[in-house]
Design a protein with these regions (language model features):
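Loop-to-helix entry region of an early transmembrane alpha helix in multi-pass inner-membrane enzymes
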Residues: 63, 75-98, 102, 118, ...
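Membrane-interface transmembrane helices that cradle and orient dolichyl/undecaprenyl
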Residues: 113-123, 162-182, 208-222, 257-271
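Transmembrane signal-anchor helices characteristic of membrane glycosylation enzymes that use polyprenol
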Residues: 12-41, 136-139, 196, 322-342, ...
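Start-transfer (signal-anchor) and selected internal transmembrane alpha helices
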Residues: 1-30, 95-98, 116-130, 267-270, ...
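Membrane-interface alpha helices of multi-pass inner-membrane proteins
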Residues: 50-53, 132-134, 181-194, 231-233, ...
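Transmembrane-helix signature of polytopic, membrane-embedded enzymes
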Residues: 18, 22, 100-138, 173-180, ...
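Hydrophobic, aromatic-rich transmembrane alpha-helices
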Residues: 253-262, 303-308, 409-430, 493-496
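Transmembrane-helix motifs of polytopic, lipid-linked glycan transferases
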Residues: 21, 87-118, 161-168, 416-419, ...
Length: 505
């Protein structure tokens, strides 16, 4: 019998693979030439020291990074141990550039109809992909993260890979291969939390592809993306004492119920249950602990209903996702195990008891208020958080990623990315709209979530909301990376527009 998976696959594109390898190689060489030869300021020294002795750094512990760091520390390819551990970021960020190339070409490939091939279609995709990959590689903040022992290089490599895998799932939806891509995505996402929570930022957008059935229409994708955008607007609406998180939860429940009423026939409910359980880790690990149990009960109930009522609820897929997510998150059990051996660096001593371990993962030492609740208590003026302001303003970081600071220099790059996003939405809404939503979540959404302090809302009684002590540009690296990809798509869109005009003439 013919292999059903093989019949669904496209011919292997050697040129595409070679160019992906070339983008990786160019990025790797540039990073290797500019990598720090010893440790850098802030967290880098702590991570290197912990990697060398398998210690426990500040919460939430970054266990996967520490374990990988130990592997690099014992390989004597350069003399200084700090120099060795820095190469985690060098290699990871080179992979980020490579996956950015693959994601850019994947988006561009949906500009064209396969039934009407043109010799220049692939060439346009290759040019846009290389441009996108190198825009990502050489954006200022990403480059800075790529040459020191920080968690963001590895986190970004996983993030971009997850989005690429999600689109591959969408292309093969309804096949066994697609389910394998989805399970791999959930595993990498939960494993990536062991590097940094930033990895999970892309998962809600990836879930749009996962939870909708094969017969979903472009309107269904648009509705879910619109829901996510409205959520961001509601955070702004209810912030600063205008209702707070309770009103936000209530409004979200109402809108969510309405959305489900519109889409319930085209939703894979078992996947939704598993996703909600895994996504609860963004609230806290304590919440995830409860949701894991609740979701397992719901899926078992779906299994019983499926057999007795002869329904196709795909409960096995839901349980598999739930299990693989737990396996990924289980990397954090390294923390109490190693802490129990009393290494020289053992912050918070998380092996003391289960409660201490959970508080460590939930970063309780930084305050008892959850990050979600903190979003609704403004710690800075909107114009400072979104505009130009020392240590925190999003636009002040964005405008210097590919040019000198200043509106004049950033306008061409901004317009290029805008063209890319608009064209992606116009050509294939099912891909373009989630991609645009992803950029909003990693830019505006992250600005709202982090709620950086500018010093104007300082609380003299609690000491909270003092001005950020250092530049926070690294938190916005995902936004800069995805905008770099959008610029690559924009170049391809302009090239294709010129081709069409010349063909018509």
């Amino acid at each position: 019998l013919p292999d059903p998976l093989k019949s669904q696959s496209e011919p292997f594109d050697r040129t595409n693979a070679a160019l992906a390898g070339l983008v990786f190689l160019i990025s790797f060489v540039v990073y290797a030439l500019t990598v720090q030869k010893t440790f850098s300021f802030w967290d880098c020294g702590e991570f290197i020291a912990c990697a060398n002795i398998l210690g426990i750094p500040h919460p939430p512990g970054t266990p996967l990074f520490v374990i990988l760091g130990r592997v690099f520390a014992i390989i004597p390819f350069v003399e200084d141990i700090s120099h060795r551990v820095n190469y985690i970021s060098v290699i990871s960020s080179a992979f980020t550039a490579m996956f950015a190339y693959l994601l850019t070409t994947k988006i561009i490939s949906h500009f064209f109809h396969k039934e009407d091939p043109h010799p220049l279609h692939k060439f346009i995709g290759y040019v846009g992909g290389v441009a996108g990959g190198l825009f990502v590689a050489w954006s200022r903040t990403n480059w800075a993260n790529s040459v020191e022992a920080e968690v963001y290089g590895l986190a970004l490599a996983l993030s971009v890979a997850l989005v690429w895998l999600a689109i591959k799932f969408w292309e093969n939806k309804g096949t066994l291969k697609a389910n394998r891509w989805m399970i791999l995505c959930f595993y990498l996402a939960t494993l990536g939390i062991g590097v940094h929570m930033t990895v999970f930022l892309v998962v809600p957008v990836c879930a749009i592809f996962f939870i909708l059935r094969k017969d979903a229409t472009p309107r269904d994708y648009l509705l879910i993306c619109a829901f996510a955008i409205v959520e961001l607007l509601m955070i702004i609406l209810f912030a600063d004492g205008r209702g707070g998180h309770k009103f936000f939860y209530f409004a979200t429940a109402l809108l969510g119920a309405g959305l489900l009423a519109l889409l319930y026939k085209r939703i894979q409910w078992a996947v939704v249950v598993a996703f909600v359980s895994i996504a609860s880790v963004m609230m806290s690990f304590s919440t995830y602990e409860k949701m894991l149990f609740v979701s397992a009960i719901i899926l078992v109930g779906m299994a019983i209903a499926s057999k007795r009522l002869n329904l196709e609820l795909k409960w096995k897929l839901g349980l598999t996702i739930l299990l693989i997510g737990f396996v990924g998150i289980s990397v954090h059990f390294f923390i109490p195990i190693r802490s129990g051996q009393n290494p020289r660096i053992d912050e918070n001593n998380p092996s003391r008891d289960w409660r201490t371990f959970k508080n460590f993962l939930d970063r309780r030492q930084y305050g008892q208020q959850s990050m979600v609740e903190r979003m609704f208590v403004r710690r800075g003026a909107w114009e400072n958080q979104l505009g130009r302001h020392p240590h925190m303003g999003f636009w002040s970081y964005f405008e210097e990623q590919w040019s000198k600071p200043g509106v004049t220099f950033i306008i061409p790059f901004f317009l290029l990315g805008l063209v890319g996003m608009v064209t992606a939405i116009y050509k294939r809404l099912e891909i373009g709209m989630p991609f645009f939503t992803l950029f909003l979540l990693t830019s505006l959404g992250l600005t709202l979530y982090m709620n950086f302090a500018d010093g104007t809302h300082y609380n003299f009684q609690t000491g909270d909301a003092y001005m950020e002590v250092r530049n926070r540009d690294y938190f916005f690296t995902p936004a800069f990376v995805f905008f770099g990809i959008a610029m690559g798509v924009g170049i391809a869109a302009i090239m294709n527009y010129i081709r069409e005009k010349l063909s018509n003439n």
